[in-house]
Regions:
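N-terminal hydrophobic/helix-forming segments and targeting peptides
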Residues: 1-167
Length: 167
């Protein structure tokens, strides 16, 4: 939602929680193909003047995206092409350390895709043939809750799913 002050109210798709995203950099992807940056912050973000700063529950109702643009009204934000329904994505902060350790937000889905692509690369590099037609099927539907079975090719009788496992 584009708020009267030009900032954005967001709602989550999936498991991201506002308290995990506070002060994180975001990108706003418009339907017109433009990308803008901003930061998710508490609506009254100044610890110096907000006496309830530490007590305020962080939810998507108490936080907002402050755009890295000179906008102070809904009209100015909309003039950039930003509208309700555009996608706001958190910076995953992906890093590969000197020792090869990979750290990132949202790594579960990336790792699952990496496993499938690694398997496909192994088959190609080793010139291996599987005994039946095999598809690597990747969906992006997990976060919206309706699964990916609708795009599985006809005739598929077996499936192996690779996903993260909460412990």
């Amino acid at each position: 939602e584009v708020k009267a002050n030009g900032r954005l109210r967001v709602t989550n798709l999936g498991g991201m929680r506002a308290e995990n995203g506070e002060t994180e950099n975001v990108r706003v992807y418009t339907r017109g193909g433009k990308v803008y940056e901003g930061t998710l912050q508490l609506c009254n973000a100044s610890v110096h003047v907000n006496g309830d700063y530490g007590k305020t529950e962080r939810t998507f109702d108490t936080t907002e995206v402050l755009l890295d643009e000179a906008v102070t009204s809904a009209d100015e934000t909309r003039a950039l092409g930003i509208e309700t329904g555009d996608i706001v994505c958190f910076d995953p902060r992906t890093r590969v350390t000197a020792s090869g350790y990979i750290k990132s937000r949202f790594l579960d889905d990336k790792l699952s895709v990496g496993i499938l692509l690694g398997f496909a690369k192994y088959l190609r590099d080793e010139n291996k043939q599987l005994p039946r037609r095999t598809y690597v099927h990747v969906t992006v539907y997990e976060e919206v809750g309706h699964g990916g079975a609708g795009s599985v090719p006809a005739g598929v009788t077996e499936s192996i799913s690779v996903d993260m496992g909460c412990v």
